[in-house]
From Swiss-Prot:
This is MPN domain-containing protein. Residues 258-393 form the MPN domain. DNA binds at residues 113, 115, 135. Its EC number is 3.4.-.-. PANTHER family: EUKARYOTIC TRANSLATION INITIATION FACTOR 3 -RELATED (PTHR10410).
Length: 487
């Protein structure tokens, strides 16, 4: 699909569609007009600026309320990054200048009005977009601009009913779109429709409510659907989470079968529980090309920090040696989202696509690469058990090569091992020692819930992945004891 044609900010009526805000700039009472100006629009005569009585007498409409007017009356203050637009998963940030113009931070383009900027940005994401309410789409320090316009009108046009002043200047057909955009913003902010319905009534203030002292307000990212992504965009947040798609939903069959050992999930889950930071590891197994069966037999935790490239190289070399000695192949990788949903981010999707191509190599035969994503502490998990998401990335359609890869949900067969192997127990001991005393180590003696500690939570999650033979449970208790002491 061809890139949308570049728009000249504020140059055409299309960029300020519903309010003709560029015309409103000319009507701006704070800018003044010459003898040939449009003073008649303010109810005056001749070339002078309309007096206060005329301006407040009702002739001054919403169209004449510009950013410059709000700045002059100190409802807004100029600043860098104070303006923002959220649209279909994209965030745009702008600077508000002293003269009321908007500078888009990404390109430095200057726009004369909120509608000009909003329409330009939305067309970049959705070329079919024709118009939109700029004052309802653009936010100033987190609050929609139309609220500031309504506040100005209430201040200066006292005869106007409050309900009328609060109405957004939306044209016919735009209300539904604005509702959809608001729903999307709530999704990106992690606000459900149920939470939205239980919000307390507004206080009438234009300033965001302060966070209570000492209370941490973390916004949990909420995944978006793949169809909302569109073409690849470097300005998009790489940590945007994307829902996985089932093969059935696109009328395709999963191209390979997967069987995973319970010991793999046991060790993986244990590793991901240890720290509040993201962890990474590799998966070893075998690929049976005749039966199209991928069997995952071993997990290899990386006992290194994500930023420690020197240690990571040494650890990876050790893992490759063990794989070779055991006659196993590298068949995938795993990592954690400690407090976020177990779905991949855009960064994860690109990484998985790269790993798939690496494992494929120059051979013509197909060899899959599996990704496992574990979320141990996400508040949306239904219980104490970690959520583990297996996924694989399908390349984008040939006609849309610039799109992101499609994260596909992979069905796995679970194979319960007979016992915990010494390799697994040894890895658990080494992991406990590696994270011992680390600042991001989970404090296992603290409360995870009113009834259970974090150590209880770990044990309950591992219980679903234990082998048939429970004879090694005393060793597991020893490992858990080490964790409790170390945290």
């Amino acid at each position: 699909m061809a890139a949308p044609e570049s728009l000249s900010p504020g140059a055409t009526a299309e960029e300020a569609p519903e309010e003709d805000e560029d015309d409103a700039e000319a009507e701006d009472p704070e800018r003044g007009t010459g003898s040939g100006g449009r003073s008649g629009s303010l109810g005056g005569s001749g070339g002078g600026t309309a007096g206060p009585g005329m301006a407040l007498g009702g002739a001054l409409t919403r169209r004449a309320v510009t950013l410059r007017v709000l700045l002059k009356d100190e409802l807004l203050e100029p600043g860098e990054g104070v303006l923002s637009i959220y649209y279909l998963g994209r965030k745009f940030t702008g600077d508000l200048q002293l003269d009321g113009r908007i500078v888009w931070q990404e390109t430095g383009q200057v726009f004369n009005s909120p509608s000009a900027w909003a329409t330009h940005c939305k067309k970049l994401v959705n070329p079919a977009k024709k118009s939109g309410c700029g004052w309802a789409s653009v936010k100033y320090k987190g609050q929609k601009l139309d609220k500031y316009k309504a506040a100005w009108l209430r201040r200066h046009q006292l005869h106007m009913p409050v309900a009328t002043a609060d109405e957004s200047p939306t044209s016919e057909g735009e209300e539904e779109e604005l509702l959809l955009e608001e729903e999307e913003e709530d999704v990106l902010a992690g606000v459900s429709s149920e939470d939205k319905g239980h919000r307390p009534p507004g206080k009438g203030s234009l300033e965001p409510e302060a966070t209570p002292p000492g209370k941490r307000m973390d916004k949990v990212p909420v995944p978006i659907r793949y169809c909302m992504l569109g073409s690849r965009d470097s300005a998009r947040n790489p940590h945007t989470l994307v829902e996985v798609t089932s093969f059935a939903a696109i009328n395709k069959f999963q191209p390979f079968n997967v069987a995973v050992s319970s010991n793999v999930l046991f060790l993986l889950d244990f590793h991901c529980h240890l720290t509040r930071s993201e962890v990474v590891g590799y998966l070893g197994g075998r690929w049976d090309i005749n039966n199209q069966m991928l069997t995952v037999l071993r997990a290899f935790p990386c006992r290194s920090r994500l930023g420690d490239t020197d240690t990571a190289a040494t650890v990876e070399e050790e893992i490759y040696q063990v794989l070779f000695l055991r006659g196993l192949s590298l068949v995938g990788w795993y990592h954690s989202h400690p407090h976020s949903p177990a779905v991949p981010s855009l960064q994860d999707i690109d990484a998985q696509m790269e790993y798939q191509l690496r494992l494929q190599g120059s051979s013509n035969g197909f060899q899959p690469c599996l990704a496992l994503l574990c979320s141990p502490y996400y508040s949306g998990n239904p219980g104490p058990e970690s959520k583990i998401c297996p996924f694989w990335v399908m390349p984008p359609p040939e006609q849309r090569p610039s799109d992101y890869g499609i994260p596909m949900d992979v069905e796995m067969a679970y194979v319960q091992d007979s016992f915990l192997t010494n390799d697994v127990l040894q890895e658990m001991v080494m992991l406990a020692e590696f994270y011992k005393g680390a600042p991001d180590l989970v404090k296992f003696q603290e409360a995870w819930s009113p009834e259970h500690t974090y150590l209880d939570k770990l044990k309950m999650s591992l219980a679903s992945r234990t082998p048939k033979d429970q004879g090694m449970c005393h060793v597991l208790e020893q490992v858990c004891s080490v964790l409790k002491q170390g945290s």
